[in-house]
Amino acid sequence: MTFIRKPAGQAKPQKYSTDAYGRPAGKFRRNGPIRKKVCRFCADKVEIDYKNLSLLHTFVTEKGKILSGRMTGTCAKHQRELDTAIKRARMIALLPFTVN
């Protein structure tokens, strides 16, 4: 009876994929697993209004750029409404286009 041996250099499959530094890639961060961002407009039933400047300022960078939905966690529907509200507020000079 003959036994077939595995080659010595064959590695075991890992449970999680790792990056170049041996850390888990994409599944974990330093304090635990990555949480999915929840759309605050869907969760709290908040209406998006172009006159609500305190709300709109949280979705604009200090340079005046609109933050993406990936950064803020908003869903696609509310991101579109947010974009139009910010653009309306800019057109009637409630928000600046750029910061000097």
From Swiss-Prot:
<feature type="region of interest" description="Disordered">
    <location>
        <begin position="1"/>
        <end position="23"/>
    </location>
</feature>
<dbReference type="GO" id="GO:0003735">
    <property type="term" value="F:structural constituent of ribosome"/>
</dbReference>
<keyword id="KW-0687">Ribonucleoprotein</keyword>
<dbReference type="GO" id="GO:0022627">
    <property type="term" value="C:cytosolic small ribosomal subunit"/>
</dbReference>
<comment type="function">
    <text>Binds as a heterodimer with protein bS6 to the central domain of the 16S rRNA, where it helps stabilize the platform of the 30S subunit.</text>
</comment>
<dbReference type="GO" id="GO:0070181">
    <property type="term" value="F:small ribosomal subunit rRNA binding"/>
</dbReference>
<keyword id="KW-0694">RNA-binding</keyword>
<comment type="similarity">
    <text>Belongs to the bacterial ribosomal protein bS18 family.</text>
</comment>
<dbReference type="Pfam" id="PF01084">
    <property type="entry name" value="Ribosomal_S18"/>
</dbReference>
<dbReference type="InterPro" id="IPR018275">
    <property type="entry name" value="Ribosomal_bS18_CS"/>
</dbReference>
<dbReference type="InterPro" id="IPR001648">
    <property type="entry name" value="Ribosomal_bS18"/>
</dbReference>
<dbReference type="InterPro" id="IPR036870">
    <property type="entry name" value="Ribosomal_bS18_sf"/>
</dbReference>
<comment type="subunit">
    <text>Part of the 30S ribosomal subunit. Forms a tight heterodimer with protein bS6.</text>
</comment>
<keyword id="KW-0699">rRNA-binding</keyword>
<dbReference type="GO" id="GO:0006412">
    <property type="term" value="P:translation"/>
</dbReference>
<protein>
    <recommendedName>
        <fullName>Small ribosomal subunit protein bS18</fullName>
    </recommendedName>
</protein>
<keyword id="KW-0689">Ribosomal protein</keyword>
